[in-house]
């Protein structure tokens, strides 16, 4: 965002918060029982905060978010709303407190689920939550397995076949292929030095 041009403020890096100095409910990392997910609820691409609240109510984990003032706040919580959040100085503190409470209730809700459960249930509801994947998660990811994304590559010096990340896309006319393993430390040093010297 052009913070200087628009509001004459220098933007400093503060993770995923942007110019809002509090965690935005539904946006950012959330801990599950067995790992983490990253949410982006309220963006134009997915379902709304009202949909997330309906899910929480359905599972009897919405606590007081179905009551006012939280319900109305949740129903309107989207990126457009966030752009107007700081326009009324008289209500900023209360809005930030409300957001902090909503986010704490959401954290408790997400913490009751495993990361795959949260991801799969979110997908069915069009809510944007993705798994923060460990290397093991990537190796076991059903979509990546189906696409045969991890590519076996021979490593003769190790006497092993290792799996490398594969093609980022598949094109029919220009197929992707891995030609060889990554070089070992210093393997091409002589070639590189000779080429640089010429």
List where the protein language model places each region:
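C-terminal core of ALDH-fold dehydrogenases
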Residues: 110-172
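Short, solvent-exposed loop/turn segments at the edges of secondary structure
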Residues: 23-25, 32, 164-166
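Substrate-binding/catalytic subdomain of NAD(P)-dependent oxidoreductase enzymes
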Residues: 1-18, 24-27
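Short, solvent-exposed polar/charged micro-motifs at secondary-structure junctions
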Residues: 1, 93, 139-143
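Aromatic-enriched alpha-helical interface/lid elements that frame and gate functional surfaces
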Residues: 26-27, 33-125, 129
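Glycine-centered loop/turn motif at secondary-structure junctions
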Residues: 60, 126, 148, 197-198
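Flexible, small-/acidic-enriched active-site or ligand-binding loops
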Residues: 155-198
